[in-house]
């Protein structure tokens, strides 16, 4: 049974871990590569406390992001229906398409919130009418926004 050393990584290392991770490695790997290159530091009680503080700050930051996304979801629910104006032809067929950027602009105009257009999922929109879009605010939070497409 070989002895393993605990080290804290100072930068990302492929197949080993990310910056700030506490990992166990072979003594030779630590002594000959990780420590001399400055890639890792030996895990002392003081460094372990720093790692735990960093992890706690990261947990707090992620929790704050989630709470912010939940608050934005509630704000989007209270906005009501958005209105998107498009040029139409015969039988209420719209020219072009309603894009995610159109929906993001309507949300910004109505709710005052910046929303990343890449997080918006739209149905196929070919005619005027009422539609729903899914807006991903956070990996765990998705809001539904209703909007009407009307003629110019």
From Swiss-Prot:
Entries under InterPro entries matching the protein: Ribosomal_bL9, Ribosomal_bL9/RNase_H1_N, Ribosomal_bL9_bac/chp, Ribosomal_bL9_C, Ribosomal_bL9_C_sf, Ribosomal_bL9_N, Ribosomal_bL9_N_sf
Disulfide bonds: none
GO-annotated molecular function: rRNA binding; structural constituent of ribosome
Entry-linked Gene3D superfamilies: Ribosomal protein L9, C-terminal domain, Ribosomal protein L9, N-terminal domain
Keywords noted in UniProt: Ribonucleoprotein, Ribosomal protein, RNA-binding, rRNA-binding
GO biological process, one term: translation
A Gene Ontology term for the protein's cellular component: ribosome
NCBIfam families according to UniProt: L9
Family the UniProt entry places it in: Belongs to the bacterial ribosomal protein bL9 family.
HAMAP family referenced in this protein's UniProt entry, alphabetically: Ribosomal_bL9
Role noted for this protein: Binds to the 23S rRNA.
Name of the molecule in the record: Large ribosomal subunit protein bL9
Organism: Picosynechococcus sp. (strain ATCC 27264 / PCC 7002 / PR-6)
Organism lineage string: Bacteria, Bacillati, Cyanobacteriota, Cyanophyceae, Oscillatoriophycideae
């Amino acid at each position: 049974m070989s002895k393993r050393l605990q080290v804290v990584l100072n930068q990302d290392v492929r197949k080993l871990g990310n910056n700030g991770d506490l990992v166990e490695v072979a003594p030779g790997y630590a002594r000959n590569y990780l420590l001399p290159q400055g890639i890792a530091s030996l895990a002392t009680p003081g460094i372990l406390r720093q790692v735990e503080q960093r992890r706690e700050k990261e947990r707090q930051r992620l929790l704050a992001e989630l709470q912010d996304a939940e608050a934005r979801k509630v704000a989007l629910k209270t906005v009501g229906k958005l209105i998107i104006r498009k040029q139409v032809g015969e039988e209420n067929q719209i020219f072009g398409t309603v894009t995610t950027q159109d929906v993001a602009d309507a949300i910004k105009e109505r709710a005052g919130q910046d929303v990343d257009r890449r997080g918006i999922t739209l149905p196929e929109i070919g005619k005027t009418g009422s539609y729903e879009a899914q807006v991903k605010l956070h990996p765990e939070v998705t809001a539904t926004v209703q909007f009407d497409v009307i003629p110019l």
